[in-house]
Amino acid sequence: MDFASRISILCFGASYAISMGAELLRFLWPHRWVRWIATSAALAGLFAHSLFLLHRGWIAQRIPIANQFESLIFVSWLMAMVYLYLIIRDRRLSAGIFVLPVTLSLVGMAAFITQNGDIADEDGTSVLSATHGLTLLVGTVVMVIATVVAIMYLIKLRQLRRGTVFSRVRLPALERLDRMNLAAVYLAWPLLTIGLGLGFMLRHLRVDDPKVITTLVAWLILTGLAHYRYQPEHRGQRVAILTIIAGIAVLVSFLGDPIFGTAHLQSPPTGEGRS
């Protein structure tokens, strides 16, 4: 683990930035070597990113998702894997210009957060606590994917209707994008529901905690979207817009700790239950 201990956010952040630059260049100049640079840089970044997380988990002897910094790093790692999966599955797909900005933004936010600034969950090694954190984070990633797919849907729709500056962007057919959106929404909802339910079961959450309020609001919006999507006739542009709204709500609940504050990770006074 000595080598892994020397890896910093700059290592994989720079790799993702190079990959993003190559994706933008590919948008203007679609040559094979540009795609190779984008893929290679992303693979190098994911390798360094994985070692960074493994080292942090090894040192702490737990899954590295116990505070805001680690959560940002973990979610950005999942998004990087999504990007690589998409471009390996379909080399012509313009996935990078949609997924990599999210990955880089999350890494950038983590870089400005003190790595040990949040108080880690004392029960972070328990199965239920780890499940609580993982289901919320994976559910957030799936909802981000649904939002990205919704944006792609709107761009594809505009391509078919008018043709725009994005005409060079290769996107799947509308029907496939709609199916991807449906699958992502139906996967995100149970994950976030389980994570939220475990959170209430494991902690005495305060209803006036901004973290709890924003998470509940996001869950209610997502629940409304999942119910709306259950109707077969509900699809198309309106569903895409509603998905983006729900995705923004989920992201606000995930990223809002430094802005709104929270008692979510703070230890209770001596002799009291955890909050």
What are these regions (language model features)?
Residues M1-S275:
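Polytopic transmembrane helical bundles with strong interfacial aromatic enrichment
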